[in-house]
Amino acid sequence: MAAKELHFNVDARAALKRGVDQLAEAVKVTLGPKGRNVVIDKKFGAPTVTKDGVTVAKEIELADPIENMGAQMVKEVATKTSDLAGDGTTTATVLAQAIFREGLKNVTAGSNPMALKRGIEKAVAGIVEELKRISVPTTGKKEIAQVGTISANNDPEIGNLIAEAMEKVGKDGVITVEEAKGLETTLETVDGMQFDRGYLSPYFVTDPEKMEAVLENALILIHDKKISAMKDLLPALEKVAQLGKPLLIIAEDVEGEALATLVVNKLRGTLRICAVKAPGFGDRRKAMLQDIATLTKGQVISDEVGFKLENAVLTDLGSAKRIVIDKDNTTIIDGAGEQKDIEGRVREIRGAIDKSTSDYDREKLQERLAKLAGGVAVINVGAATEAEMKEKKARVEDALHATRAAVEEGIVPGGGVALIRAQHVLKDVKVAERDEQIGVDIVRRAIEEPLRMIVQNAGGEGSIVVEKIRTAKETSFGYNALTDVYEDLVQAGVIDPTKVTRTALQNAASIAGLLLTTEALIVEKKEDKPAAPAGGPGMGGMY
């Protein structure tokens, strides 16, 4: 085992502070509408140009192992805030640096770190309650567009696209971000339920121009096993043929004699029919087939419950107004399912999401929920170059997270103003001793820091702006750094999701509290490697 190096008390905290400051200084230049760019060197390809705090933070590794510890702990603040709220990473970093810096001065002057930490926690709890009180629910498309615009570094095109997507698919809908082939950034929405399985044979196509099979007012047969023998399918097919309605067969697979017979009947015009494979795999496939059955008011014909395919009757089949199948996807529009059954199924999936511990499972459950409850929207991000594409895609993803957070917990005035507005509650925080009061005062000073930084990046003087806003009476009065005017920020569209501001403060205080109460550091000792031996003499005339 390699030898370790130990550092204690003042030395340890001073080294941590150097690391925290290096990371924070690189990140906080990006804060606000007039934040500066950071250029990150890449081993391959063009350098990345970004104004996204978490992207900058993730790239930072310091040479000194102790300083690097401090930097990594603050990086944790940025990434945790990004994961939970999707935005506010730079604000969280600025707050963590400010709380740690002010706290360190007091610890060095003899304050008890544990009492400071208790004071910081009490102050943060008070501010979080006040943020919830001044929070306003997001109701309209306009507010969602404003939140998206701010999170996408003041790009109204992205804000409007996200608002439109949310309006179309609802708050439970899935919105995905893809790279477009051209320069335009566009929005595509899919009504109804879509799954990624296409027709099993191109002979099923009804529209040769678009290479699509379109079935109007169709019945749907859902089976969880392979269909290869025609005799199993025949009874159901005869009943459907008598009705004269189109039929979609969804099964694990349709092959051999069964597929050939279906194709022949389709080509002769005896049946309007199409067959597709069931979506998903294993248990997820069973669940997705049950979702389709609920949506279309059908039954999953399954041997597992003693339900054989040859015994299927018309009432076991689902139905939908329109079904569109291309070579890759099947879309079921306007299924005949009862609303109460669909809502029951949605509640089941929501329960499973709450209990799920795996991110992957949760994502898949969320997709199923969207297909049942809302719909699916795809934002195709277009740009002129690869570097611009990456940067823009990251901004769209940030803005998407932030708008979801706004819908969840509401909005507060942006531009660092909400924290200043919540400052007054700190005078009522009950403390047990003087050092706890110092902890409360540390937070009082630290929550001004995001506003100071926004003003500083815009070329102004932070202290003057903070004082002017603190003495104003209106809750949403603040400084709009983009236009350089004082105005009602909510009306001007400068708003932040409450969840973003709350998460940034809580995460920053948590890590700063840990850093302040650190008394020892253990790092691996650097080994003094001996110089490499010089090369040996040449081998003479040997070949």
From Swiss-Prot:
GO cellular component, one term: cytoplasm
GO terms under biological process: protein refolding
Single annotated GO MF: ATP-dependent protein folding chaperone
Keywords: ATP-binding, Chaperone, Cytoplasm, Isomerase, Nucleotide-binding
Main subcellular location: cytoplasm
InterPro entries hit by this protein: Chaperonin_Cpn60_CS, Cpn60/GroEL, Cpn60/GroEL/TCP-1, GroEL-like_apical_dom_sf, GROEL-like_equatorial_sf, TCP-1-like_intermed_sf
Reactions accelerated catalytically: ATP + H2O + a folded polypeptide = ADP + phosphate + an unfolded polypeptide
Residues the entry annotates as binding ATP: 30-33, 51, 87-91, 415, 480-482, 496
EC main group: isomerase
The protein's Enzyme Commission number: 5.6.1.7
Keyword ATP-binding assigned: yes
Localization per Swiss-Prot or TrEMBL: Cytoplasm
Pfam families on file: Cpn60_TCP1 (PF00118)
Family assignment from sequence similarity: Belongs to the chaperonin (HSP60) family.
Role this protein plays: Together with its co-chaperonin GroES, plays an essential role in assisting protein folding. The GroEL-GroES system forms a nano-cage that allows encapsulation of the non-native substrate proteins and provides a physical environment optimized to promote and accelerate protein folding.
NCBIfam families: GroEL (TIGR02348), PRK00013.1 (NF000592), PRK12849.1 (NF009487), PRK12850.1 (NF009488), PRK12851.1 (NF009489)
Oligomeric and partner information: Forms a cylinder of 14 subunits composed of two heptameric rings stacked back-to-back. Interacts with the co-chaperonin GroES.
PANTHER family reported for this sequence: 60 KDA HEAT SHOCK PROTEIN, MITOCHONDRIAL (PTHR45633)
Name of the molecule in the record: Chaperonin GroEL
Underlying gene: groEL
